[in-house]
């Protein structure tokens, strides 16, 4: 079973297996997130983060207002959240651990003149490259095997209106010794449009490419939307969801499907 429940210990918030850690408070080096598995390590910090900003664990298991059926269908401890309120002026930063993915939400609460967010990434035994699809691949330094993917970012406002994928992009700079500068850029005109409803969520996730499942949801205004690390699929009169798996486990005839 996957247990992504979080606990506080000393200056850290971490999963039980300690593979994923968050800073309880932003200190001098500004480290926010550490992912450590086997001989691979990823450390991320947000440039300009307001010092002494604290991270709070958001309880996913309480599910206030959920129906009995929703609670029954929710896998306990599969996901967990950490929120850094006002880590930048008018910006919250939220991390959601879901299954094997770490979803990062930059929550923009008010208009600004610039929507570029810079992260410093320190890698151990990994190399980073921005590929032709606009996603970032983190590969083993020796074998070249892709260990993690940072898919292309998405952005949506409080009304659920998504930005066209052409309005968001990454830039990646190798500064040496395993350190990289990652910038998440969102089009200013789209963000400042009178049609926007705040807050706006900018979503650059980190995922482990281990799943045999591919899913996609599109509508007429978001025909090229792609968010492979998003755990949800929109289905409605205007949204169409598609789901594909390349392999299925053996299911005996006597099995009950619940």
Language model features with spans:
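Residues that cap or anchor secondary-structure elements
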Residues: 1-209
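Flexible, small-residue-rich N-terminal segments that precede or flank a structured functional core
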Residues: 201-257
């Amino acid at each position: 079973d996957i247990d992504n429940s979080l606990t506080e210990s000393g200056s850290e918030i971490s999963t039980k297996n300690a593979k994923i850690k968050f800073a309880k408070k932003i200190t001098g080096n500004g480290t926010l997130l550490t992912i450590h598995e086997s001989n691979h390590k990823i450390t991320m910090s947000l440039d300009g983060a307001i010092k002494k900003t604290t991270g709070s664990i958001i309880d996913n298991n309480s599910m206030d207002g959920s129906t009995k059926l929703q609670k029954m269908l929710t896998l306990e401890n599969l996901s967990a959240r950490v929120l850094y309120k006002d880590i930048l002026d008018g910006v919250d930063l939220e991390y959601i651990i879901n299954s094997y993915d770490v979803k990062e939400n930059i929550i923009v609460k008010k208009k600004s003149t610039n929507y570029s967010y810079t992260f410093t990434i320190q890698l151990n035994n990994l190399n980073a490259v921005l590929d032709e699809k606009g996603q970032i691949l983190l590969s083993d330094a020796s074998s070249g095997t892709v260990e993690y993917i940072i898919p292309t970012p998405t952005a949506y406002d409080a009304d659920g209106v998504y930005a066209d994928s052409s309005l968001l992009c990454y830039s990646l700079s190798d500064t040496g010794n395993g350190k990289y500068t990652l910038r998440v850029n969102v089009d200013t005109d789209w963000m400042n449009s009178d049609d926007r409803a705040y807050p706006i969520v900018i979503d650059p996730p980190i995922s482990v490419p281990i799943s045999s499942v591919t899913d996609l949801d599109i509508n007429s205004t978001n025909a090229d939307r792609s968010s492979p690390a998003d755990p949800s699929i929109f289905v409605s009169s205007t949204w169409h969801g598609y789901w594909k798996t390349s392999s299925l486990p053996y299911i005996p005839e006597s099995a009950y499907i619940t």
